[in-house]
């Protein structure tokens, strides 16, 4: 018997190892999930509140290499330069609509406030909660003050909790859908591909995202 055969016979599976944030506090995460996140998500599913998950992703125009079914190995042409496209996004927890603020420089507190203003202007019918991490450009007096003026509740995640931020799954989806194993000759084409993918979350990608963006959150209580 081969080692592979013996392993399969004994119930072993060939799985890629996962990783967890080094400094996460599983107890804090569990309390947050049960006492804060689940209640607002229940309001969202009952159409009593708009809940968004906010985060920034910095897409660098480089070769995104993935796995392909092919007869011979395929090589993807690498673009010249390292231009970066910054997307500050807010993912609606129920409809999966994405509201974005984008630029080619950097994301800061003013970017966050601009996105909050967009959301407040568009979603006027229900209370609004934004779930976000503790990045300095998000958790500060300026942003919190502006959010208060806009009557937006900011719900900050426990530290080191990307697993509780739904939009993190969307960023991985975008890379898989329009960046992995694809070559874009020019930076505008690269940006357009990302923008198009994000604008199609409620139509073209609706079926795929309905299973990816469920309100089931993995907690890491049993890691080695």
Language-model features: where?
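Short functional hotspots at interaction and active-site rims
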Residues: 1-224
């Amino acid at each position: 018997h081969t080692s592979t055969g013996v392993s399969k016979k004994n119930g072993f599976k060939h799985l890629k190892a996962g990783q967890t944030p080094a400094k996460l506090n599983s107890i804090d995460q569990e309390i947050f999930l049960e006492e804060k996140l689940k209640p607002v998500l229940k309001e969202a599913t009952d159409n009593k509140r708009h809940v968004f998950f906010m985060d920034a992703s910095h897409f660098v125009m480089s070769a995104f290499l993935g796995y392909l079914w092919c007869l011979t190995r395929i090589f993807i042409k690498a673009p010249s330069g390292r231009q970066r496209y910054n997307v500050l996004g807010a993912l609606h927890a129920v409809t999966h609509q994405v509201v974005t603020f984008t630029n080619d420089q950097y994301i800061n507190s003013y970017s966050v406030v601009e996105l909050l203003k967009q959301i407040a202007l568009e979603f006027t019918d229900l209370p609004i909660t934004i779930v976000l991490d503790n990045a300095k450009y998000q958790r500060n007096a300026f942003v919190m003050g502006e959010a208060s003026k806009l009557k937006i509740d900011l719900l900050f995640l426990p530290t080191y909790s990307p697993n509780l931020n739904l939009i993190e799954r969307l960023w991985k989806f975008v890379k898989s859908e329009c960046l992995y194993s694809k070559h874009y000759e020019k930076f505008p084409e690269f940006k357009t591909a990302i923008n198009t993918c994000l604008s199609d979350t409620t139509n073209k990608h609706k079926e795929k995202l309905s299973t990816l963006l469920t309100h089931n959150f993995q907690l890491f209580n049993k890691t080695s």
